[in-house]
Regions:
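Positively charged n-region of N-terminal signal peptides that target proteins for export
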Residues: 1-4, 18-19
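Sec-dependent N-terminal signal peptides
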Residues: 6-9
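C-terminal motif of bacterial Sec signal peptides marking the signal peptidase cleavage site
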Residues: 13-16
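Primarily secretory-pathway and cell-envelope proteins
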Residues: 18-78, 126-190, 287
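Hydrophobic residues positioned within well-ordered beta-strands of beta-sheet architectures
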Residues: 43, 116, 160, 171, ...
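Tryptophan-paired
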Residues: 65-130, 182-270, 295-301
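Low-complexity, Pro/Ser/Thr- and charge-rich linker/hinge segments at domain boundaries
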Residues: 142-145, 266-279
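Acidic, serine/threonine- and proline-rich intrinsically disordered appendage/tail regions
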Residues: 277-301
Length: 301
């Protein structure tokens, strides 16, 4: 009887060990598996943002996670987390800034190798495309991203701090001459502007030619050198260029001034500023590459 009990004990041990070693990686291809039933470990990710760029940014700022995720002085509104194993999305989370656990998403990760992709943004009207693994915004604004790799075993530390990198770029239009009292808006039309992000690669997607406008408050009428309009986009790590038409329009929609910008360069975590006289004839714009991402502005779009 003792021998039988010992044998049964060994068999139970073998079964338990086999279950412990079962991971998503060794499931047969095409097999339909409920990943939530695999051995797993609970992870809590504390999300923050690192705004330092080795080339352009001199000072680092961080998200005040988990309560308040902020980029350029404004709160992020959306946080997405996508968990991939064997190049397949097995689970995802979408948080908004009003969620109780905002900035500290939790996931149970099955044992094995994971790529966990994070996206934090305050862009307007986001649309998620699961098949294309991308997010496209109606109006992109400050946005951060990270591809975070983790190997999950039974002894893994389940508390992880994840630092995201800025993938947004910015066009700044600075008007140096006096603002007329009937100015209604500043409009820009880039020939190419990226509105989306491939959350697996971090590449900019969804290039569009679309007009963007910023409404000018009456408090700027009669002022000189104060009018600054910001226009955000998504950018990859490589520099790219586009041509831009700029118009200043009156409150009656009349054109008060305009300019053409050729070959404007853009790159993630960088502001490209054009400054000059928009209302004076023959004024033109000067270009500068700026690390002053967070300066006060008249308006943004």
């Amino acid at each position: 009887m003792k021998k039988i009990i010992m044998l049964m004990g060994c068999l139970l041990c073998l079964v338990a060990c086999e279950k412990e070693n079962l991971t998503y990686e060794n499931i047969d291809e095409g097999e339909d598996v409920d990943v939530s039933k695999l051995p797993s470990k609970k992870f809590t990710f504390t999300v923050k943002g690192e705004f330092e760029s080795a080339t352009f940014m001199s000072n680092a700022t961080t998200f005040r996670a988990p309560v308040y995720l902020s980029g350029d002085g404004n709160a992020m509104t959306d946080l997405w987390v996508f968990d991939y194993m064997n190049d397949r999305c097995v689970q995802s989370i979408h948080q908004v800034s009003t969620d109780e656990s905002w900035g500290k998403p939790q996931m149970s990760l099955a044992y094995g190798t994971h790529h966990v992709y994070f996206v934090a943004s305050r862009g307007d009207s986001p649309t998620l495309d699961d098949e294309g693994h991308m997010i496209v915004w109606g109006i992109p604004k400050d946005t951060f991203w990270k591809d975070y790799s983790v190997e999950v075993v039974s002894t893994s530390n389940g508390n992880r701090a994840v630092t995201l990198d800025r993938v947004a770029t910015k066009l700044k239009i600075s008007v140096n001459d006096e603002v007329p009292s009937n100015l209604g808006e500043i409009a820009v039309t880039p020939e190419k502007w990226y509105y989306g992000l491939d959350y697996k690669t971090g590449d900019a997607v969804s290039a569009q030619k679309k007009e963007r406008t910023v409404t000018v408050p009456e408090s700027y009428y009669g002022t000189t050198g104060r009018l600054v309009a910001n226009f955000f986009g998504i950018s990859g790590s490589d520099e790219w260029t586009t041509n831009i038409a700029v118009e200043a329009r009156g409150t009656d929609a009349s054109v008060l001034g305009k300019a053409s910008i050729t070959g404007a360069p853009f790159k993630r975590n960088r502001a490209t500023e054009y400054s000059g006289n928009l209302f004076a004839s023959g004024g033109g714009f000067d270009v500068s590459i700026s690390d002053d991402w967070d300066n006060p502005v008249t308006g943004e779009c």
